[in-house]
A protein has these predicted regions:
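Structural microenvironment flanking redox-active thiols in thiol-disulfide oxidoreductases
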Residues: 60-100, 114-115
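Sec-dependent N-terminal signal peptides
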Residues: 4-13
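Boundary of Sec targeting at the N-terminus
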Residues: 19-20, 32
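A short beta-strand-turn-helix
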Residues: 25-46
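Conserved hydrophobic packing residues within short motifs/helices of P-loop NTPase cores
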Residues: 46-48, 81-83, 128
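Short pre-active-site segment immediately N-terminal to redox-active cysteine/selenocysteine motifs
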Residues: 43-46, 50-54, 123
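Thiol/disulfide oxidoreductase modules built on the thioredoxin-like
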Residues: 97-103, 111-154
Length: 160
């Protein structure tokens, strides 16, 4: 009986990590709508990183990744979708923040936090890695200096 329960729990845990992206409609900074279940990177892994303009750890993480992003792209082809959860009254702060930091990510807006809530995410930064088949293979909440190295290692492992 214990073995059956353990097997069920392990199967459930694996299925949570290998889930597909939910269908939520977000907007680009130019106002175009995009459904999250259509996000892709031409069969290569991609990262979804939830942030807010007021979140200092989020900004530190995205700055740290920005320093190595071009190298990551050349090596692995990885793409990053940075998803702002700033509420409607703060959305106008996103574009200047992105511009001031020189982030080259595809920026998406989730002012109601619906996309983040779909993952039961409450704390940001909240980061997902999605494999080339569109399956979520990694989830992480929070940021400590140097944690971006773990992200690229996980992406590299997907390409082996």
């Amino acid at each position: 009986m214990k073995k059956a329960i353990l097997t069920f729990i392990m199967t459930f845990a694996v299925s949570l990590c290998e889930a597909q992206l939910p269908a939520v409609t977000l907007k680009t900074m130019n106002g175009a709508e995009i459904r999250t279940d259509t996000l892709s990177n031409g069969g290569k892994p991609f990262i979804i990183d939830f942030f807010a303009t007021w979140c200092k750890p989020c900004n530190r993480e995205l700055d740290a990744i920005s320093e190595v992003y071009e190298e990551w792209q050349e090596e692995t082809g990885v793409k990053i979708f940075a998803v702002s959860i700033d509420q409607a009254q703060n959305i106008n702060k996103v574009k200047p923040l992105v511009s001031n930091h020189g982030w080259e990510y595809e920026i998406l807006l989730d002012p109601n936090g619906e996309f983040l809530r779909a993952f039961s995410g409450h704390a940001i930064p909240y980061t997902l890695i999605v494999d080339g088949k569109g399956e979520i293979v990694y989830k992480h909440s929070g940021y400590t200096d140097g944690a971006e190295a773990e992200l690229i290692e996980k992406v590299r492992a997907l390409l082996k």
